[in-house]
From Swiss-Prot:
Belongs to the HetP family. Promotes heterocyst differentiation and commitment when nitrogen is limiting. Interplay between the 4 HetP paralogs controls the timing of commitment to heterocyst formation and its duration. Epistatic analysis show that the 3 paralogs act upstream of hetP to delay commitment (asl1930, alr3234) or inhibit development (alr2902). Asl1930 and Alr3234 must also attenuate the activity of Alr2902. Required for heterocyst formation. Functions directly downstream of master regulator HetR to promote heterocyst differentiation, functioning downstream of patterning (cell choice). It comes from the Bacteria. In bacterial two-hybrid assays interacts weakly with Asl1930, Alr2902 and Alr3234. Induction: By nitrogen deficiency; expressed in proheterocysts and heterocysts, transcription requires hetR and is suppressed by patA. Transcription is up-regulated by 6 hours after nitrogen stepdown, and remains high for at least 24 hours. It comes from Nostoc sp. (strain PCC 7120 / SAG 25.82 / UTEX 2576). The first 68 residues are fully capable of complementing a hetP deletion. Residues 1-50 are annotated as: Required to complement a hetP deletion. This is Heterocyst differentiation protein HetP. Keywords: Heterocyst. In Nostoc filaments, approximately every 10th vegetative cell terminally differentiates into a heterocyst specialized for nitrogen fixation under nitrogen deficiency.
Amino acid sequence: MNQNTTGITNYNKAINPQQFDKVVEAILAGKYSWACVLMLRFAGYNPMHYIPYRTYNRLLKENSEASKVQQQQHDNLKNSQVAAVSRSNTNMPSSCLSKIKDLAYLEVVGKQTTEIHGGNLDQWLTEQVHEFQDMYLEPQAISNQDITFKLSDLDFIHN
């Protein structure tokens, strides 16, 4: 599988802590589409290649005022905290981690007992009849009967 990556110039680009903060703020505000746009931008992709034109313009319009305010705050923060820039990119910014309250929450999920089957209605109906008979009829009566039918045997479906 060969993929053409000539159009992607920044595929190994890492986002900085301020950009990560913006994405987390958008997620915490419930603006998941805007968070996707930000992630695509920060990763070096053009969001227009992945999001419909009208949706992208609506997101830009909704978030343009918020972006201007955030940009001013970002510039003020950048000017006042020059020493903070030397922080390693591998460390998570503490400002966004403190906003996620259930970060340490862990729930162990057991193995699911139900399986997903294909869309064979005849087989499903046969299984339902067997399960019903197993629950409500005597086991002796079930073993003596042959329970197979087709959709054409069901009169109520044709009506």
